[in-house]
């Protein structure tokens, strides 16, 4: 039985981390093997707080060892990683990706390098950002950063579309074959912007921006998951990006229309198979400097 190994956070209530990523990949036709870095009652934006615990790096390694014992790693089509709770967990992920690629050289590694955002800065524990930037992102086949995380990896500030394109080129030169910027903040506030960069070209995706009373948590995890599943279907990065962008819009639209804070992942599940709206991609290039 082939499948996707997804190593990220988990919430019992709502959709964030694995709770946002696992079902969409299953709905797109893939077996998913989730390993949780933390397990919380709910996401951490609730005023009432949350309960739960973080798992150790050894907990992750132990589960991977068990999967290896039954021959599962050679059937692993991709490793998808998101939020990591400690620097040691990052090292366990590095070891896991190495083991999976030894067992199946065709396996993809998709890294969502959760670090922070421009308005919040770096929000992760000490050592995590360094391990993401120096270990996990360079070894990934695909990275799915936001604008802040891309700027950290490319070691440059991003204020314009040209800056973003240059940053993506710098990122591609460090190892990854595909860069999907899941939120490009520096462009118009009137639209939500995402960017895809490969050696073949760079594409901008724009969709209407929703004015949520409280922004849903877990949309980035959803983007990474749908894109991973699209690539494993044999689609080109451009095709997977188009599908991912349209499907994510559909889920967010359903969430907005329902007046909900938590993503309406189950109610809008048809979006993962057949998105209801289509927003054509725009190929973009660096403006010629006179």
Swiss-Prot record:
Q: Which InterPro entries match?
A: PM/HMP-P_kinase-1 (IPR013749), PyrdxlKinase (IPR004625), Pyridoxal_kinase_PdxY (IPR023685), Ribokinase-like (IPR029056)
Please give the superkingdom of this protein's source: Bacteria
The UniProt record lists the keyword Ribosomal protein: no
User: Part of which pathway?
Assistant: Cofactor metabolism; pyridoxal 5'-phosphate salvage; pyridoxal 5'-phosphate from pyridoxal: step 1/1
Q: Name one GO molecular function term.
A: pyridoxal kinase activity
Which residues are recorded as binding ATP? 112, 144, 149, 182
| Keyword presence, Iron | no
Gene3D superfamilies membership? 3.40.1190.20
Q: Which cysteines are joined by disulfide bonds?
A: none
Q: What family does the Swiss-Prot or TrEMBL record give for this protein?
A: Belongs to the pyridoxine kinase family. PdxY subfamily.
Q: What's one GO BP annotation on this UniProt entry?
A: pyridoxal 5'-phosphate salvage
Q: What class of enzyme is it?
A: transferase
The EC number(s) attached to this protein equal 2.7.1.35
Query: What cofactor does this chain's UniProt record say it requires?
Result: Mg(2+)
Instruction: Return the Pfam families for the record.
Output: Phos_pyr_kin
Identify one Gene Ontology CC term for this UniProt entry: cytosol
Q: How does it assemble?
A: Homodimer.
Name the keywords, alphabetized: ATP-binding, Kinase, Magnesium, Nucleotide-binding, Transferase
Organism encoding this protein? Vibrio vulnificus (strain YJ016)
Q: What does this protein do?
A: Pyridoxal kinase involved in the salvage pathway of pyridoxal 5'-phosphate (PLP). Catalyzes the phosphorylation of pyridoxal to PLP.
Reactions catalysed, semicolon-separated, are: pyridoxal + ATP = pyridoxal 5'-phosphate + ADP + H(+)
Amino-acid positions noted as binding substrate in the UniProt annotation, renumbered to this chain: 9, 44-45, 221
Q: What is this protein called?
A: Pyridoxal kinase PdxY
